[in-house]
């Protein structure tokens, strides 16, 4: 069963054509790797699939109950974020109050090896920040 069908994907980035009428599908059993040299559109393709970026042209059909999370290469956090606040969903993307997510976020952070929830994001390594961003997705 196909969970994603993409047809006629065309997209440019600053005058450079990244995708020219590309079509493909992913089934529920597929495991896919996206490989290529720097600047060929790997991250852009994933952002388009996740709905974080809009293609110049594409017909994208996804299974109705499909949930997609996108974890950027370099997660962005405010300098004021702590381990816990950085793990909470972004308030403009959720309908509930962030406080409703605190117990689940703490549990997931603990599973990933975090014990201090008040530690400033600025004190964490890139890998630690990526794990916090994973909790947020």
Predicted regions and their residues:
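ABC nucleotide-binding domain "signature motif"
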Residues: 56-64
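Conserved structural motif at the start of ABC-family nucleotide-binding domains
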Residues: 4, 18-21
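Helix-to-loop junction immediately C-terminal to a conserved catalytic motif
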Residues: 50
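Conserved N-terminal beta-strand of ABC nucleotide-binding domains
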Residues: 8-10, 21-24, 59
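The feature captures the beta-strand-to-loop junction immediately N-terminal to the Walker
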Residues: 35-37
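ABC-family P-loop ATPase nucleotide-binding domains
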Residues: 2, 8, 66-68, 73-132, ...
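Conserved hydrophobic segment flanking the Walker A/P-loop of ABC-type ATPase nucleotide-binding domains
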Residues: 26-28
